[in-house]
């Protein structure tokens, strides 16, 4: 194999990738393989499309492990163990969930901590992340282990989300000891409460100041469920959102996985012990 290793400075989500990275990937022959391992983000390409969409159009398969700067060295063994999992069993669980979500009109999530949020998902398709990327143009992040879906349009989410797992901010992920509460009306976060509310508010504001359409930043963009039985909460979103027995919600962009919202921000927030109701029926998974 002809392998090329490329390095660049640390990038935030709104920053552009270094020129030599952009040039190398744009000039890569079709149907190649790209592996991204970065402490934060790979950066933007300035093509009006996401890295994922770029890879799909060129037939590249890819693996990405982002935000590794959030992983404490003491958790490295735990992080690696999440990849030592039966992907066959995980796929079976993922396909069961996807089948239900693809047919759903609404998905409601409740938790003992107080989460009660409803997503209108009629006509939307769930995405599975199980680490199986054999087809050209496919790819995803590692460790694997989640199913997620965008809401229908901009306004199809309402309710309250009590984030008691981990939260994503501009400065990295935080393993929560006290919950963060998000109030969502007509698809948009209208109020944030909790000890760390100012950190998420700062994150939203920072991206709104840079976004072409600032109002999109606070829109609910994703509902997800973790299905990796080897994963545990460590304060790194790339792992935390995969933990079996957790759920997550994201605000910001979702156009690259079938949604309508396109913006420079995408941030996941993780909550514990979710119960999902698909068109009123409790989901067993």
Predicted features and spans:
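Histidine- and/or cysteine-centered catalytic micro-motif in compact active-site loops
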Residues: 122-124, 164-167, 185, 189, ...
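Internal helix-turn-beta structural module
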Residues: 234-284
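Active-site bordering "gate/hinge" segments
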Residues: 1-160, 166-177, 185, 275-285
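Dual-mode signal for accessory low-complexity, basic/Gly-rich regions
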Residues: 175, 191-251
